[in-house]
Amino acid sequence: MLPGFGAQTVSPFPNPPEYASAYTSDRINNGSAPPPPHPLTEFKVYGEEYRLEDDVIAPLKNAGVAELYKNKNNWKTEMKKLNRSAIVAFFDLVEILIRAPDHPMREEKMVDLHTIFINMHHLINEFRPVQARDSVRILQERQIEELSDICKDFKKYLRDGREVVDDQFQMIRGKLPAPPQPSELTRVKLQDGVLHMLQETEASDDVEMKEEEGSEYSKKKARLELLSREDGPPSVVHLLARQFHDISLKK
């Protein structure tokens, strides 16, 4: 920033024209604003003049070229006629070049071919607007098809989502099946028919084993209790003895 100059805001858009200052809200309301400027009907683009009142495609007569087709609306028939005329003129030119290359008819046939090709090109350009409309129509049809496919996909996703939600609601509202009975090997049992309230039970096999062992099991239990008995805090030996005692009882 230069010294003595403050920050200046530069707009990326050009300033409005000077006559815009004459169109204030007050002048527009009281009718004192001048009439708007007339639109340009003639302009130049790359040195070529254009007039808005003229046709989009100027006729050949304006360019000083003979118009060989009569009805431009029946363009297929006229294009076939011009094509045949071009072929005949070309054969005539070849024959002249073979027999008499310096004959004056050679220049005439070349001019005829030039005129025929200009007419064919001009007739094609006459249907550029028709081609543009058809291109827009085809583009819109494709866009409609794409939108229809997208709508179908959305409907399918919505239907699948509703099915999933309905299934979940049915599972919540429906009555849950009764829990299965636990096996005897798990050593658990149900309390009041509730699955999450389990109580450990002593298996019947352990009871039978204890009854069969009899006095031997009682002696072993008494010996372990004697080793683990001590006044005061238990030592490491007695803690190990108690652990062995618990393990033996579980077996």
UniProtKB/Swiss-Prot annotation:
* Keyword flag Nucleotide-binding: no
Q: Name one GO cellular component term.
A: core mediator complex
GO terms in the biological process aspect are: embryo development ending in birth or egg hatching; regulation of transcription by RNA polymerase II; reproductive process
Q: Which SUPFAM superfamilies match?
A: Mediator hinge subcomplex-like (SSF140718)
- One Gene Ontology molecular-function label: transcription coregulator activity
Q: Does the keyword Transcription regulation apply?
A: yes
Where is this protein found? Nucleus
Q: Which domain of life is it from?
A: Eukaryota
Q: Where is the composition biased (Polar residues)?
A: 22-32
What are the entry keywords?
Activator, Developmental protein, Nucleus, Transcription, Transcription regulation
Q: What does this protein do?
A: Component of the Mediator complex, a coactivator involved in the regulated transcription of nearly all RNA polymerase II-dependent genes. Mediator functions as a bridge to convey information from gene-specific regulatory proteins to the basal RNA polymerase II transcription machinery. Mediator is recruited to promoters by direct interactions with regulatory proteins and serves as a scaffold for the assembly of a functional preinitiation complex with RNA polymerase II and the general transcription factors. Required for germ cell development and gonadal growth.
Q: Which family does it belong to?
A: Belongs to the Mediator complex subunit 7 family.
What protein am I looking at?
A: Mediator of RNA polymerase II transcription subunit 7
User: Which organism was this protein described from?
Assistant: Caenorhabditis elegans
